[in-house]
Regions:
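Extended, charged alpha-beta segments that form solvent-exposed binding/catalytic grooves
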Residues: 2-224
């Protein structure tokens, strides 16, 4: 008995080719030479200034970033990759590294070491941000942290290291130094900022309207 050809023909299902998630990027072999060059320069300058390397977990307790970065910041409110794991713990992919370094300093009793403790790190961070040219949701960060040292001296040294690193990479940079002032002057500035913002309340975006009463200095961080 002949079978109708149309009945034999079945639609072919096309399998969608897997792609990287939005805001993520593969680093291909021909790019690795640049990454390795930067890593080598970063290692060399960190060692030259007596910084020790530290590697922290990519995954941390969500509360670590809520407490240290700030509950009302864009990072915590909008940009963290966070979820509840199979053990019902609230965890987050690290959006930055300073909080993790501070946690490690406490967890491993580094307070008992000769101060200041100088640490450097390098690795991927994650923020659910709007991807743009050269800006990804997984990005790589090199950083230095000094805990237990005089602030002004540490600030000067970190600025010097940053300039030297750029110079070692063959980049010409112009350094502009800003200051958030002292605790006293910052409070005075905050009062003036609130007064100005209230006069222009109708021009504020939704985020800034909320920040005005909760954390006025964050008005300066408006992305609109």
């Amino acid at each position: 008995m002949a079978t109708d050809k149309k009945e034999e023909e079945k639609p072919v299902k096309r399998v969608k080719t897997p792609e990287t998630l939005r805001g993520m990027k593969d680093i291909l072999p021909d790019e690795q030479i640049y990454w390795e060059y930067f890593r080598r320069k970063a290692r060399e300058i960190s060692a030259a200034y007596s910084f020790g390397r530290i590697d922290m977990p990519i995954l941390e307790d969500e509360k670590l970033f809520v407490r240290t970065v700030g509950k009302q910041t864009d990072i915590v409110e909008k940009e963290m990759y966070n979820f509840i794991d199979k053990g019902e713990s609230k965890v987050a992919l690290r959006p930055e590294a300073t909080a993790s370094v501070a946690r490690a300093y406490i967890n491993h009793g580094m307070l008992n070491l000769p101060q200041p403790v100088k640490l450097w790190y390098m690795g991927p961070m994650f923020r659910y941000d709007r991807p743009q040219s050269g800006r990804y949701r997984q990005f790589h960060q090199y950083g230095l942290e000094v805990i237990g040292g005089p602030d002004s001296v540490v600030d000067a040294q970190l600025i010097l290291i940053a300039v030297r690193l750029f110079e070692d990479l063959g980049l010409k940079v112009k350094v502009e130094i800003n200051s958030i002032g002292t605790a006293t002057t910052r409070q005075e500035y905050k009062i003036e900022l609130i007064a100005y913002a209230r006069k222009h309340r109708k021009e504020l975006c939704e985020d800034c309207t909320r920040r005005l009463s909760r954390n006025p200095l964050r008005l300066l961080d408006c992305k609109q």
